Amino acid sequence: SMTQWYPKLAEYDFEGWHPNPYIGREFHGVWSDYTVSLSIDKSYVVGGTGYLQNPQEIGHGYENTEKSLKRPDSKKLTWLFYAPNVHDFAWAADPDFIHDIVEGPNSVELHFLYKTHVENWKKIQQHSVDLMTFFNNKIGPYPWKQYSIIQGGDGGMEYAMCTLITGGENYGSLFGTTAHEMGHAWFQHALANNEAKHPWMDEGFASYIDAMAENVVLKKNKKNPFLRSYQSYRRLANSKMEQPQTTHSDRYSFNVAYSVSAYSKGAVFLAQLGYLIGEEALDKT
């Protein structure tokens, strides 16, 4: 898994420069069109950000099967990717990846790259279509034509046009992580807020929308799908470890204070806003 793997420019916006180093938590990047070439042993299957520009030279499930495959006679293949209008680029490679492509809403290609727990990774494919359909209807259309869900990384982490998810052994965990990380395609990658400065605006918003999506897609019919967020925030509020919601993500004194403030309190914020102004009005904001 290759993430945070290249020197990044500091973002400059109306607030000035944001030169915060990446310390394994939140990050903020510069909008750009990425052209990336990766030369790697021909046995490896690659997935990640961007559209593959030379699928008939690569194969590995990317090619048009109605056309001839023309691989170069070499030990390595050079993968050419183009990613328009994104602010990050991530990729993963493994010779044992299984690569499936499923058509999602609005003809978006959903790519799945995985090695183990095949039954669960097959099962998540239709649910991923359902999740993207829900997010499209609730938030707005996914702005790219491809999204990849890749078994790799550490836990689950969102990147431009893709997510990396470690597991798959437990389907509930795989579904929940997929729902949350896919939600980040809107709340952080499309919205492009400074998640390092305002982590609750991406983690909290993603937690809010993934709870709604899980309730609908899995037909759980919970009266309050945000109950766990309320319970988590209540424990933090009673712990005397809570810090101001404006605290920078890298400046929390306690990791639990960061996690609950960003994820749970952020979700509670939207749930409470919906209670105050109405769900219909919230959907329009």
Q: Which stretches of residues belong to each language-model region?
A:
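Hydrophobic alpha-helical and helix-loop surface patches within well-folded domains
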Residues: 81, 111-285
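Hydrophobic helix-coil surface modules that form long, contiguous segments used
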Residues: 4-18, 23-179, 208
